[in-house]
């Protein structure tokens, strides 16, 4: 493909990270591959496209990641974010219902948050509508991430007694 890529991870020294960001901002590097580095403290406003492959149910983390990409920059009027979510198979399997429902409860609030701010909100929601409806969980399209996160923490503490 001829893309110039560079890793942007915690093992890269701070001074080298700054140089990498400069190269990215001026176009010498077209792709940054980052792990956890977009959660806090890194500004990359020139980014126009991002692919989030590591999911988190922590709203603070995913809002910060998204915010790093959506910052204003000269010549940039929008950004495209692809947030990959994990969902059950399309074919409903009653024996796995509890596992699949748990997965949806974790992923859907983040999806709903991202979709609500997206230009393709209704198209994105329609792609998952039938799947979520099979589990009778359409309410997840409107659940707020912080509410879900607090519920997950409470459930985790309940089971760890």
Feature annotation, model-predicted:
Residues 4-122:
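Conserved RecA-like P-loop NTPase helicase motor core
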Residues 1:
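Conserved strand-helix element at the start of the C-terminal RecA-like helicase core
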Residues 93-161:
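Long, largely alpha-helical accessory region at the distal end of helicase-like NTP-driven motors
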């Amino acid at each position: 493909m001829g893309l110039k890529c560079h890793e942007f991870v915690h093992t890269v020294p701070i001074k080298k990270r700054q140089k990498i960001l400069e190269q990215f901002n001026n176009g010498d590097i077209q792709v940054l591959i980052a792990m956890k580095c977009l959660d806090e403290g890194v500004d990359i406003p020139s980014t126009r496209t991002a692919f989030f492959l590591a999911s988190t149910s922590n709203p603070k983390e995913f809002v910060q990641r998204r915010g790093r990409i959506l910052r204003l920059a000269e010549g940039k009027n929008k950004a495209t974010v692809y947030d990959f979510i994990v969902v059950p198979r399309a074919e409903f399997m009653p024996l796995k219902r509890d596992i699949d429902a748990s997965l949806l409860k974790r992923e859907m609030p983040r999806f709903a948050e991202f979709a609500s701010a997206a230009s393709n909100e209704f198209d994105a929601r329609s792609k998952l509508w039938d799947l979520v409806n099979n589990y009778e969980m359409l309410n997840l399209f409107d659940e707020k991430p912080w509410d879900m996160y607090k519920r997950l923490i409470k459930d985790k503490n309940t089971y760890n007694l």
